[in-house]
């Protein structure tokens, strides 16, 4: 069987063997409903508490009760935006939300939905480097602003947004602040206190945990109308039977993610840089966005004259997995929205390829990717009508 190389880790990651190992007993033996009063239920409580302890410490929250279990970051993002709509827009008349054009569809689409209900949403444009400034946020805030929602790191470019500065402005202005940290956790340090975040979303499968489980940090003292009703789980904040094995797995994945932060920076970052430098030697290849203020695993490259989908399928034939952008939208085969937002033509935006590494990638895999990518660029340009 040919070697398979996975370079789509911003879409999802392989589960860490240590995570699977710690989950197994709760799939096989300790399968009781935690809400049950008998021993099958109560014996799961220590493991849940330990997992929550790992989660709140992993983001430097003040209290274990500040982290609420959800099914994924999409749910977390929806909960924040719709909860703020109920709590601030309807009840207090604060009918304005500030976000950016670079957000994940889970935020953008929810904001579009809220607009249909009469909420005013300001979508801050990104600059030629793919970022925004804290000053843009400050200028956009009005007395009617209920929430600012800005991602910590972009899923396509890996660019890190000025979260601490934005959080400080929101605190000063008395505006709630939410950050989608899905692409930051496990790659760079994430500290909700330094960020002055009121809400923070995360998803286990982006840091080598299981799919179908995520979390939402809600700062102590901040209220948020529940998205789901029908039970008193998570202190009455999120109804639904607790998914014990996945909670346990997510806790362990968070612990391992924090432990591997130096490895991400020193090893994964150097592999990404090696890949990037080699690809830049191919004529008319460019890296999209700021190359300095990024998470260490991500590069978004444009190969002029080659449709991103064509390159993607060529790599796939050689058992190399990459992406043209967000996995939640990639089946649509639309132009890369970040490239469009920074002012690239739609023709150029269609040439984007995202390569995202993990701690499980090897230098041999990167060398093979460089070889295959370079050969594919030559072959596809020879048959391209636009190069």
Curated annotation (Swiss-Prot):
Domain of life: Bacteria
Keywords tagged on the record: 2Fe-2S, Cytoplasm, Iron, Iron-sulfur, Metal-binding, Pyridoxal phosphate, Transferase
InterPro entries for this protein: Aminotrans_V_dom, Cys_deSase_IscS, Cys_deSase_NifS_proteobacteria, Cysteine_dSase, PyrdxlP-dep_Trfase, PyrdxlP-dep_Trfase_major, PyrdxlP-dep_Trfase_small
Broad class of where this protein is predominantly found: cytoplasm
UniProt catalytic activity: (sulfur carrier)-H + L-cysteine = (sulfur carrier)-SH + L-alanine
Localisation per UniProt entry: Cytoplasm
Catalytic center residues: 328
Function statement: Master enzyme that delivers sulfur to a number of partners involved in Fe-S cluster assembly, tRNA modification or cofactor biosynthesis. Catalyzes the removal of elemental sulfur atoms from cysteine to produce alanine. Functions as a sulfur delivery protein for Fe-S cluster synthesis onto IscU, an Fe-S scaffold assembly protein, as well as other S acceptor proteins.
Subunit comment: Homodimer. Forms a heterotetramer with IscU, interacts with other sulfur acceptors.
The protein, known as: Cysteine desulfurase IscS
Organism: Helicobacter pylori (strain P12)
């Amino acid at each position: 069987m040919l070697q398979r190389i996975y370079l789509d880790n911003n879409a999802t990651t392989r589960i860490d063997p240590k995570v699977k190992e710690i989950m197994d007993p709760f799939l096989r033996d300790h399968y009781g409903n935690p809400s049950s009063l008998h021993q099958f239920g109560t014996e799961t409580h220590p493991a849940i508490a330990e997992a929550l302890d790992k989660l709140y410490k992993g983001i430097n929250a003040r209290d274990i009760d500040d982290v609420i279990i959800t099914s994924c970051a999409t749910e977390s993002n929806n909960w924040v935006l719709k909860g703020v709509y109920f709590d601030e827009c309807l009840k207090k008349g604060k009918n304005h939300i500030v976000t950016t054009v670079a957000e994940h569809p889970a935020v953008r689409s929810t904001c579009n939905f809220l607009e249909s209900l009469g909420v005013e949403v300001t979508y801050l444009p990104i600059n030629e480097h793919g970022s925004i400034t804290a000053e843009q946020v400050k200028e956009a805030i009005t007395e009617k602003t209920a929430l600012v929602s800005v991602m910590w790191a972009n899923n396509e470019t890996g660019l890190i947004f000025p979260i601490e500065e934005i959080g400080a402005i929101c605190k000063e202005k008395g505006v709630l602040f939410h950050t989608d940290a899905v692409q930051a956790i496990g790659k760079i340090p994430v500290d909700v206190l330094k960020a002055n975040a009121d809400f923070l979303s995360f998803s286990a499968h982006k840091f080598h945990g299981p799919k179908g489980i995520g979390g939402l940090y809600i700062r102590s003292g901040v209220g948020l109308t529940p998205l789901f009703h029908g039970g008193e789980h998570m202190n009455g904040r999120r109804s639904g039977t607790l998914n014990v094995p996945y909670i346990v797995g997510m806790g362990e994945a968070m612990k391992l993610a924090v432990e591997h932060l130096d490895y991400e920076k020193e090893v994964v970052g150097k592999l990404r840089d090696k890949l990037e430098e080699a690809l830049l030697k191919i004529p008319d290849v460019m890296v999209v966005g700021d190359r300095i203020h990024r998470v260490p695993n991500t590069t978004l490259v444009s190969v002029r004259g080659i449709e991103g989908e064509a390159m993607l399928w060529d790599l796939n034939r050689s058992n190399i997995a990459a992406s043209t952008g967000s996995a939640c939208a990639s089946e649509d085969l639309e132009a890369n929205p970040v490239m469009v937002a920074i002012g690239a033509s739609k023709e150029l935006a269609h040439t984007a390829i995202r390569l995202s590494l993990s701690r499980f990638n090897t230098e041999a895999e990167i060398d093979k990717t460089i070889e295959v990518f370079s050969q594919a660029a030559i072959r596809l340009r020879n048959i391209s009508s636009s190069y």
